[in-house]
């Protein structure tokens, strides 16, 4: 044992303490995953060493084969995991093992409910890595030295996972990391070769490095040699380099958990080898749930990049557009150079070709999922639908393909579920209908009862109901689908084309003419609040409604701009009246101009509320309404 110097005791970051406590209790039912997590980290350490050694070969310190060794001591009740990867300096150890440098950590911890099952899913998607050791160990010792540093700059980190850790400088001749788990009482099962072998085969067979265990001798061979003989217990070949026919679903699933640091199986994957002008292999996964930081646009994203099977970088985000940032996986290129950097990636035309092909592959994978496994696609849509809606604005070339993957709620049923594909909508269109009708709003309950839908209900025309905050912005980039134009039913002068008969159109014109006097009176009273007053073609039951001008911003877009601190251009709505409604007939017959003005303002405010808008002067509305109620009850 080497002499320890510069020993100090430090406290864990608050979030680490919380996470340790929650994890030990929430993940206990799946405790064997600690080995998968530690092996995954060791594999990453070897990848990083290979990459840094491209520019600095001395880091390999003699070039012994990179490997991971797992051993155990029944008497001491310990499990030891050792790698000869990049290793850690004292600073690395304090940073990586004492803090969590993830954006959104505090938000993530707030979402934990105390429900063990739910929390285990959340913690799983956060990625626990090293800390999973404390599920089975009551003390963990880490001995490490970073490649390239002298033997005298090794480091020993030790903790019982209870709020603080010790760190000291030691002599460590060999680079890399050795982790010793002092197993808790009751966890002796892991100090066993057969048990460890099974866990490694189950979770880590796909790891490209050899994972070695001491060879066990039985019967006549029971006298073990003093020095252990090591044997490799995993396949030790990069999974994506193997032919698809040879890879089992379980292997694909475990590999996903390794690259994505996820605890759950993916929804789907696509493994593909491209040969010809470009040569690369990709293995892309659609996760089963959204990560907690999906909407943090600065959160790390991207694929693991390898060049000729040599790891180059994590989170290479140049291979997929931002709206597919949830996709996980690996891309291994034969065309890029080994000294490729992020700056080179951003300028290399080869990358553009790969990005285009990989994007198409992901969209094809999603199409296949939607067609063959609609229930799975429903899960996908629930988790990632809003992110996919960013696609039409970002990826003009694939706009139609992305639009085909979108799902919406509609008046076709009362579920409020976003389950209607545009192709389904078109398949149900009425004879003579050549447009796709939609309505945006704050919530499903608000839009499903909107007066804007009255004429559509009467004629049996389906309308898509769009209530996600991004929807109005999305539709500004999606003018049509399959040659059919999108029409916002709350915008402009509604024209149903051939869905209105000639008699209907003639009747509308005559009614509008007969109400010209009323229209003029309303314009005079509401002049400051409206851009226009007209007879409505939308209404059958309500007395009045507000429509948006053809070029004006809708409520959702105004809110988005206001929230981002941008100036919102002033605009006034169009006030439409239903001439057949008894209230409008009474209003038309009202001789007292003051009373006419009060009633007109009440109708205008009610129309604003029905459209989901807020009142500019709610006090005045309440005063007018109370006055009217007093008159009626007199």
Curated annotation (Swiss-Prot):
Residues 1-342 are annotated as: A. Residues 343-559 are annotated as: B. One of its GO terms (molecular function) is unfolded protein binding. Its main location: cytoplasm. GO terms for biological process: DNA damage response; protein folding; response to heat. Keywords: ATP-binding, Chaperone, Cytoplasm, Nucleotide-binding, Stress response. SMART domains: HATPase_c (SM00387). InterPro entries: HATPase_C_sf (IPR036890), Heat_shock_protein_90_CS (IPR019805), HSP90_C (IPR037196), Hsp90_fam (IPR001404), Hsp90_N (IPR020575), Ribosomal_Su5_D2-typ_SF (IPR020568). NCBIfam families: PRK05218.1 (NF003555). Homodimer. Transmembrane segments: none annotated. This is Chaperone protein HtpG. Coiled coil: none annotated. It is found in: Cytoplasm. Molecular chaperone. Has ATPase activity. It holds the Pfam family HATPase_c_3. Belongs to the heat shock protein 90 family. The keyword Transcription does not apply. It comes from Pseudomonas aeruginosa (strain ATCC 15692 / DSM 22644 / CIP 104116 / JCM 14847 / LMG 12228 / 1C / PRS 101 / PAO1). One of its GO terms (cellular component) is cytosol. Residues 560-634 are annotated as: C. The gene is htpG. It comes from the Bacteria. PANTHER family: HEAT SHOCK PROTEIN 90 FAMILY MEMBER.
